[in-house]
């Protein structure tokens, strides 16, 4: 069982993993502005979202940013393109402020 650590620079890449492995995705975020990362296709049978949390860079500093920490377990063989968007939840008609896309092949 392996844990693969990824960040925004991994967007556009393809990774190969095995069932039982984990993907750890850390994306910079500042929810005080209303923006946060949303997984667009979290309903799939290849990756299971096990952890979704925000970590402040500077604890106790109002308005500071941090990272959205996401951990996925590879549940079975297959292929999925994991997509995330950086947007405000109430701005559904606007394009996202940022995107992340990763093709995951599990074999």
Regions found by a protein language model. Give the residues of each.
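Short, solvent-exposed loop/linker segments at beta-strand-coil boundaries, enriched for Pro/Gly
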Residues: 41-57
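Aromatic sugar-binding surface patches on proteins
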Residues: 63-69
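Ligand-binding face of N-terminal immunoglobulin V-set domains in extracellular IgSF glycoproteins
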Residues: 70-71, 83
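Interdomain boundary/hinge segments at the C-termini of tandem beta-sandwich modules
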Residues: 104-106
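Glycine-centered tight-turn and secondary-structure capping sites
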Residues: 75-82
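N-terminal edge beta-strand
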Residues: 1-24, 30
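A charge-rich, low-complexity, intrinsically flexible signal that marks solvent-exposed coils, linkers
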Residues: 12, 35-38
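Short acidic/polar inter-strand loop motif in beta-rich domains
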Residues: 87-94
């Amino acid at each position: 069982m392996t844990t693969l650590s990824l960040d925004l620079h991994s967007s556009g890449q393809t990774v190969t993993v095995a069932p039982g492995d984990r993907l750890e995705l850390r994306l910079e975020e500042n929810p005080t502005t209303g923006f946060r990362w949303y997984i667009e296709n979290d309903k799939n049978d290849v990756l299971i979202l096990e952890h979704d949390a925000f970590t402040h860079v500077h604890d106790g500093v109002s308005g500071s940013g941090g990272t959205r920490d996401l951990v996925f377990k590879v549940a079975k063989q297959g292929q999925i393109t994991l997509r995330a968007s950086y947007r405000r939840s109430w701005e559904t008609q606007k394009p996202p402020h940022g995107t992340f896309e990763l093709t995951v092949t599990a074999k």
